[in-house]
């Protein structure tokens, strides 16, 4: 009997990819050894790592991080690169944010990195409603916004909580997933979510056509997450919601231009 069969009370349909469903809702501790070392860790100092989709320009790829390759996922906290393939996990919490990362382009002259975790007020340019750098198109020159609106999905996985982001070309895919959830009358964590990687052509400003990787999200409505795991997800949700409300829901790559906002 495998370890999963020995501990899991739920055996969903076999998944061909990276199955990150946390079949054990609580971390496994060595027998008779209590969890120690958290006494002096401030909850406000804790950050949620991101599960980033790598591209050819991603720092991990250009720096030659082991196994890093376009189209694969990397855990920003441990720099663990997952095997090639789709991912299955459980979405727990959602929030929208805005992010602006200056590029080597005249449009970004004298601009600074600005991140609005709550989608309301940025770290540099203040209220997003007044700034509009992440939402307003340059219709005269047919240019997209300088920054980007971002869908942030905090997920419960066997690697711990992670943030999965969808922006720019994958923003609509994230919106479609949200619409499915909203119309269902269910919690995100009622069913597992499959994150698929797709390869699509993209025409560069030079006219050259290249391939880029994008994300699609699908709710596995044929699989019901068992009550015990849903309760664990709900407890995590309450913690995340409180952090978001107080402005403390942060990721350890929020200040990095390679955070995934502008790469998809």
Residue ranges and their predicted role:
Residues 185, 189, 194, 198-263:
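Accessory, usually C-terminal, subdomains that scaffold auxiliary metal cofactors
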Residues 1-159, 206-211, 220-227, 263-264:
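OB-fold ssDNA-binding interfaces and closely related basic DNA-contact patches used
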Residues 142-220:
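Extended serine/threonine-enriched, polar tracts that run as long, contiguous segments within proteins
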Residues 49-52, 63, 129, 176, ...:
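Polar/charged alpha-helical tracts
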């Amino acid at each position: 009997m495998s370890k999963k069969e020995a501990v899991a009370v739920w055996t969903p349909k076999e998944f061909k990819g990276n199955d990150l469903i946390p079949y054990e809702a609580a971390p496994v501790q060595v027998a008779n050894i209590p969890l120690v070392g958290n006494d002096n860790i401030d909850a406000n100092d804790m950050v949620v790592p991101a599960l980033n989709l790598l591209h050819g320009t991603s720092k991990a790829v250009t720096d030659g991080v082991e196994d890093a390759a376009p189209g694969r996922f990397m855990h920003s906290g441990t720099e663990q690169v997952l095997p090639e393939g789709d991912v299955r996990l459980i979405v727990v919490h959602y929030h929208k944010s805005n992010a602006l990362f200056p590029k080597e382009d005249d449009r970004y002259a004298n601009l600074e990195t600005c991140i609005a975790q709550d989608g309301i007020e940025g770290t540099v340019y203040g209220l997003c409603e007044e700034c509009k750098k992440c939402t307003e198109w340059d219709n005269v020159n047919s240019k997209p916004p300088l920054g980007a609106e971002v869908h942030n999905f905090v997920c419960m996985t066997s690697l711990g909580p992670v943030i999965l982001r969808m922006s720019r070309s994958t923003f609509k895919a994230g919106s479609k997933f949200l619409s499915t959830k909203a119309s269902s009358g269910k919690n995100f964590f009622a069913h597992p979510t499959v994150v698929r990687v797709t390869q699509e052509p993209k025409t560069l400003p030079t006219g050259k056509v290249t391939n880029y990787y994008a994300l699609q999200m699908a709710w596995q409505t044929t699989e019901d997450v068992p009550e015990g795991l849903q309760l664990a997800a709900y407890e995590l949700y309450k913690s995340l919601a409180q952090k978001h409300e107080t402005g403390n829901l942060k990721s350890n790559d929020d200040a990095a231009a390679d955070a995934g906002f502008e790469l998809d």
